[in-house]
Structures are given as structure tokens and as C-alpha cells.
Amino acid sequence: MRIIFAGTPPFAAAALEALADAGHEIALVLTQPDRPAGRGMKNASSAVKLLAQKRGFGLLQPPSLRQPELHMQLEAVRADIMVVAAYGLILPFSVLNIPKLGCVNIHASLLPRWRGAAPIERAILAGDRETGITIMQMDRGLDTGPILLVRSITIAKDDTAGTLHEKLGQLGAACIVEALALLQQGKIIATPQNDLAATYASKLEKTEAEIDWRMDAENIDRAVRAFNPRPGMHSTVNGISMKVWQTSVDIAETDEKPGEIVAIRPDGIVVACGKHALILKIVQKSGGKKLRSAEFLLGHSLHPHDRFESGE
């Protein structure tokens, strides 16, 4: 197939490479403009841009898809289909009708559950046991189009948003290759979504990243995994602001108040929560490196009954 591909992060780059390796013609790649990133805030290219340059694909980085000139460029490509994966820009309805077979999206959830911007993180936060990839035909709505193909995977107890992004990136790559092959063979039947079963995955807000120790330890543990690697859950104790990167739940009941340190153990700092306790295993002081709690405590004095501040 002759394809226009639109995507930005590594999740999308995996799909682009798989499509090219499967023999499809990548006629044009769209990705977001370079943006400041890292400590130096220097302009950085997206994973999709780097791959497109490496493979010699035609590349455009428009700030918006609403310009008439861009529509003319897309029409001139005469693509069979447009594949969209974590692009980050809204596709106007007029663009959806440009390719012969329209536009399909690689969405990182089991639609109609978790439509929207942060399906991977919201699945972890909700304690979902499985997630997956949905290949869907794009329409006017937000992830509302007919389903072409679905594949699921189990969410492991130690999965973070980062590890799940990697797993789903590989699954998404395999799924889009499979879906296009079935489409070419006329073996796909588009299935409408059940709107009554839809849930929405709103983007993560910074206000959600402050630990509220009044919550159940299990819920905080999920939040730590969902916010890893970005933006990272954080809390403050004895004036020390730290991010918490890895935790586990201690189901023993405690009499301490939420946020109060119950014990300092070889496996981590045990903190009381609204229910049960949380073991902080890997932490990072503001401006410092990620450290196992035992290493962190070599340079910072924390004791039982010291209390973390609680976000609300």
C-alpha cells in the first residue's frame, strides 16, 4: 500500500518501521515540529523524524493540519491510506477523506475503554488487568470510529507507563501490519464501538503527581507506576522534596497517621497510608540522581515518625 504516516514518539516509530519492513510504500511522513527537550532545552527531533531521515522518507513537520496548502500536498501524494499513531495533532475531517481508504489509528487501549490522550497511564491508575491495541477507522469523534482489529496483553504488576509503552509499541507495530494485510485481502469487517461502554483517558495533570498519603497504598503504588517516567510522583519530608519511582505495598496494618514513616528497612522506607503502607524503594531528591532508598539514606537522615506532607 502507498501510505502517509503520521506519528511522533517511539511508540509510533515502531509502527512506521514495521510498515516499511513489510514492504509498504511510505510516501510521506508527518511528525510534530522539533521542540525543546532535556536539561539544556535544546530543540530535539521526534523518534519518527529520526527514523524517517534514516530511511529516506519524505517528511513534513507542520504545526497544524488546517492549512489549505498542506491539504493540496496530501492530495498530491495519492495515498491508499493514512496511518496515525500518537501524532499529537488533530486531524480535520477534511484530511480524513483524502486517502482512498481514509485514515486508521493505532490506539493504545481496548476501545471503547480509554478513549483519549493518556490511555496507558489511565489503565494502570484504574488497576486494569489488561490493555491492548485497537486499530480503528478514524471519524469525526475522539477515538470513536469503527474497530478493525483488537489485540490484548496483560498488565504486569510491576508495569510502569514506560514499560507498557514499549510493549504496546511493539504490539501496535505488529497489529497495523496485520490489519493492512487483512484489509488488502478484504477480510476485515469494521465493528461499531459501543458508546455506552466508553471511558475517557484525560491527559495527566501536574496536580495529580503529588502523593496524597490518605489514599490506599495500592492506589498510590498504581499512581507511581502510571507517572513513571513522566512526570513522576513526588512528596516532601523534613523539607526534602523527592520523586518516588518504585514502590510496593505492605499489607500490614499500622497505627501511624497517613504520610508517617513506620519503619526504615533494608527493602525501603515504609510509609503509612490511608489503608496499609507503602514501601519506597527507589527515590530521587530534587536535582539529584535516582537511588535505592538504602543509598538515599546514607546522605539523608530520616527516622520513624517523620511525616511526609500530603497532597490534596
Curated annotation (Swiss-Prot):
The keyword Transferase applies. Signal peptide: none annotated. One of its GO terms (molecular function) is methionyl-tRNA formyltransferase activity. Keywords: Protein biosynthesis, Transferase. GO terms for cellular component: cytosol. It catalyses: L-methionyl-tRNA(fMet) + (6R)-10-formyltetrahydrofolate = N-formyl-L-methionyl-tRNA(fMet) + (6S)-5,6,7,8-tetrahydrofolate + H(+). It is an enzyme of class 2 (transferase). Its EC number is 2.1.2.9. (6S)-5,6,7,8-tetrahydrofolate binds at S109, L110, L111, P112. InterPro entries: Fmt, Formyl_trans_C, Formyl_transf_N, Formyl_transf_N_sf, Formyl_transferase-like_C_sf, Met-tRNA-FMT_C, Met-tRNA-FMT_N. It comes from the Bacteria. Belongs to the Fmt family. Attaches a formyl group to the free amino group of methionyl-tRNA(fMet). The formyl group appears to play a dual role in the initiator identity of N-formylmethionyl-tRNA by promoting its recognition by IF2 and preventing the misappropriation of this tRNA by the elongation apparatus. NCBIfam families: fmt (TIGR00460). PANTHER family: METHIONYL-TRNA FORMYLTRANSFERASE (PTHR11138), METHIONYL-TRNA FORMYLTRANSFERASE, MITOCHONDRIAL (PTHR11138:SF5). This is Methionyl-tRNA formyltransferase.
